[in-house]
Amino acid sequence: MISERRTNYSEKQNRAGCDLVFTVPKSCSIEASRNEEFRVVLERCHKGAVENTLNYIEQNYIQYEQKKEGMKSIVKTDNMICAKIEHTLNRNQEPLIHTHAIIINKTRDAEGQYRAIHHGQIFKNQIFLSQLYKNQLAKELELNSCKIQVVDKARGNFELIGYSREHIEAFSTRHQQIEKETERLIKEYSSRGIELPLAEIKDRATRLTREAKQKADMPKLQEAWAITRAECGIDTIPKQHPKALKETLNPIDKKDHLDRALLEISNKTTAFRKEEYSALALREGLGKGITQDDIEKYFANKLASNTLFETWAKGSIHYASKESLALENSIYKIGRASCRERV
C-alpha cells in the first residue's frame, strides 16, 4: 500500500513524500469496464473511502520530530499536504482503478513553521490503514445495493459476487509478472544466503518488471477487454445495478461482531494496540457494514464502563480487557504463592 518517493538531498531530508496506493478489488475494475452505471458509483465510493482514510491519517498519524535540550520527542499535528493522482489502468493496460495519494514531507507546527514529517506511525499501521479503506469501500458499495463477497477473510479482501479467481486472473497479467519475479528473486537470494523481508522483495520485483507507461488507446483497449470478457465467461455474470439503500446492520449486530473480535485478540495477548484490534475487527466485519467509526464508539463505551483499560507497553498506549487483566493477576498470584512455598 505504501512506498517512498525520494530525492537526492541529505539523509534527513531525502524523503520527498510518502506514496499511499488505494486500489479497488480487481472484479470492481473489470465490472466498471463493461458497466457505465456501476463505474460512476464505484468511482464515487472509491474516492469517499480514500478521503476517509486520508482524514484518519491526518488527524492521528501526522507527526514531526522535535529536539530540545538534547532530548528528542515526537510531536503530533493535525495537518498535511496531499496530492491525489487517479488512474484507471495498470502498466499492462488492464482495468485497475486506483489512486496514488502522495503525502508531502511537510506539516505545520503550532507556530506555523513547516517541519519534516515523522512517518513512523503511517508505516507501522499499513495493514490497519489498508483494511480501513477496504471496509469503507465495501460499506459504500453495499449501501448502493452492490453485491459483494468476502474471498479472503484472513487478509480482509472482497470481490463482487459472480467473479471467480479465473475471471480475475484473466485481467491480472501485471500481478502475475510481479509474483513470478518475486519467486525468482526469493530463489536467487536464498542461493546467495541473503535474507530479506517478503515486502521488500515484492517491491524490488515490482520495480524490476515495471515498463514505461504507454499512451492508452481506449477504444482499442475496450475492444480487447470485450474479447477477453467473452472468452473467460464474464459476460454471463449478471451486471451490478447500483441503487441507494439504507444501512441494514443494526447496532446490536455490530456490537456482537466487535465483542467477538475483542475476545479473539484478548485470547492471543493481554495488551494490544488499538490498530491491532481495529485491523482484526474490520476484517471480521468486512461486508457487514463495520467501519472505524463503529470501533471508536465501541472503545469509548468500553473505557467508560471500565471493561477495557489503557495501559503502557512497548513504548506506546495499549489496551487490555477486564477479563485479561483479571486472568493475568491471578496467574501472577499463583506464581508468587509457588515461589513462597519453594522458599
Predicted regions and their residues:
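Helicase P-loop NTPase motor core of nucleic-acid translocases
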Residues: 1-343
